[in-house]
Amino acid sequence: MINRQLSRLLLCSILGSTTLISGCALVRKDSAPHQQLKPEQIKLADDIHLASSGWPQAQWWKQLNDPQLDALIQRTLSSSHTLAEAKLREEKAQSQADLLDAGSQLQVAALGMLNRQRVSANGFLSPYAMDAPALGMDGPYYTEATVGLFAGLDLDLWGVHRSAVAAAIGAHNAALAETAAVELSLTTGVAQLYYSMQASYQMLDLLEQTRDVIDYAVKAHQSKVAHGLEAQVPFHGARAQILAVDKQIAAVKGQITETRESLRALIGAGASDMPEIKPVALPRVQTGIPATLSYELLARRPDLQAMRWYVQASLDQVDSARALFYPSFDIKAFFGLDAIHLDTLFKKTSRQFNFIPGLKLPLFDGGRLNANLEGTRAASNMMIERYNQSVLNAVRDVAVNGTRLQTLNDEREMQAERVEATRFTQRAAEAAYQRGLTSRLQATEARLPVLAEEMSLLMLDSRLVIQSIQLMKSLGGGYQAAPVVEKK
């Protein structure tokens, strides 16, 4: 008897082992994950030499000491619909992670069921169709009632649910980083529009000064023509100049309006509650980048952090897809009362208990699991390649923006010298007029080259500010990777 039991146990063990091995054998050759760029590969080319500086600080715009800009950015962060949408994506990702996590926990539900039925006299339960109280049958009508607790638990031995939950948590962490990327895009966008408007205000002022000078020249030439002292050619030449300046003034005013409307949309202002923007001087900005990039760039760029989390989530999804090849175990149980007559439902004899352990092993699925694994792996490798390219693009952004900024700084130094040279010429013309060596018209027109060079200097200053903000963005704008959200 004992030998027979041992033989049966051995046979069951052999069959179980064979089944498990055959199940694992269903996995075809899985391709390896693609390599991610290593931190030591994240650096500028050796022939690029830029001034060194530190990483941007959080709330970098406050270092510009501009209360107007502070107020605009604060309003943007509090009322932006784009940012609100990003935060809702966070909530959605969190709920998805919670939903998957809940599916792997113990599930308990209260069960109540009432079934009024007529038993067929020709069916499998035909004896119960008889009306024979002596035999315990009073058919054909019965009212079956069931009440109790039903419980179920998936034993996630191979990590199908665990990996799926980890992937969902990775997607949530990516959503957090994407929200930071949206904030960075909004703050830099507001700052760029704001200083573009400030540059337009200053350009408008210089153009109006230029118009005043040319207007004086027009009146002076008109007076000379009226007195027969010169031909009309200088007068009409000055008139053409003033019309050209008027055209530039109209264009700058239109640009101010366009910039204001773009800023209005970005900060979420209505038609009547756009704050007044007063002219202020453009700030001087830093032109350097951190001495090294490496892992710091990965941790300080929110878009790269988001991509990194999506890569991790894709790898977790691959683990979940692989685990589907292995046997799954679950346990179901019921404890309660069941009776075919309502008047006996709550009697002790109506108690019922079910304990149902289950095993499921995929053997023949037409290649569905392998196709799912191949597709999941391909999607993961695509995400890795996208991440690698994003890292390279981030390094490119730093190199390009840093180089442009340094070039603009060099150009500004040379342009400042040109402005000083024309100012010297103007001062000389003014001095000659004071000594009676030249006319007032010549002394006044000597301001025109100065104003022209000051406009060129203003354009460089504006480009410097905009480019520095762009560099700030490419360095992450003071972002640092938030603490990892993990499963509780």
Predicted regions, residues:
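Sec/SRP-type N-terminal targeting helices
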Residues: 84-85, 101, 141, 155-183, ...
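Transmembrane beta-barrel architecture of outer-membrane proteins
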Residues: 69-71, 144-146, 192, 237, ...
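Membrane-embedded beta-strand positions in outer-membrane beta-barrel channels/transporters
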Residues: 73, 146-150, 194, 239, ...
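Small/polar, glycine/serine/threonine/aspartate-rich low-complexity segments that form flexible
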Residues: 55-64, 113-150, 273-290, 319, ...
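Terminal intrinsically disordered/low-complexity segments used for targeting and assembly
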Residues: 2-78, 126-131, 138, 169, ...
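Periplasmic alpha-helical coiled-coil/stalk elements that build and connect Gram-negative outer-membrane
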Residues: 177-293, 404, 408, 428-431, ...
